[in-house]
A protein has these predicted regions:
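Binding-site signature for planar aromatic cofactors or substrates
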Residues: 1-125
Length: 125
């Protein structure tokens, strides 16, 4: 796991709308979802609430690598790539439950463990 750069942390606070969370199946076929129930955990990981994962959950269970893509209000794109951890209890799960709307089930918390961070085509770390 790498440390998220301050530029990305600041951009996260200025993101506009949903993120795109992409995983891959065993054959390498990508699956992308929009996610709005997301958070930045201790400035280390992007957490996505599992409210209605289907293919995404199967991919995570099969060890998929993943990426998160988001844009800021001024239209700047950021992408984080890495491994995915999945939490059904513990501090990451508790963090997700604090902000996930009660109307959604919040079955678990997918946590993207960053290995590379980009702003557009520029590698930040």
């Amino acid at each position: 796991m790498i440390q998220l750069p301050q530029e990305l942390i600041k951009a996260w606070d200025e993101r506009d709308g949903a993120i795109v969370f992409t995983t891959t199946d065993a054959d390498g076929t990508p699956n992308s979802i929009y996610a709005t129930c997301v958070g930045l955990y201790e400035e280390e990981m992007i957490v996505i609430a599992n409210n209605y994962f289907d293919k995404t959950m199967k991919n995570i269970q099969n060890g998929s690598r993943a990426s998160v893509l988001f844009i800021t209000k001024d239209g700047k794109a950021y992408q984080i790539k890495g491994q995915v951890g999945y939490h059904m209890r513990g501090p990451v799960y508790d963090f997700m439950k604090k902000w996930n709307p009660e109307k959604h089930p919040g079955h678990g918390a997918a946590a993207l463990i960053p290995e590379a961070v980009y702003s557009g085509s520029e590698k930040l770390s």
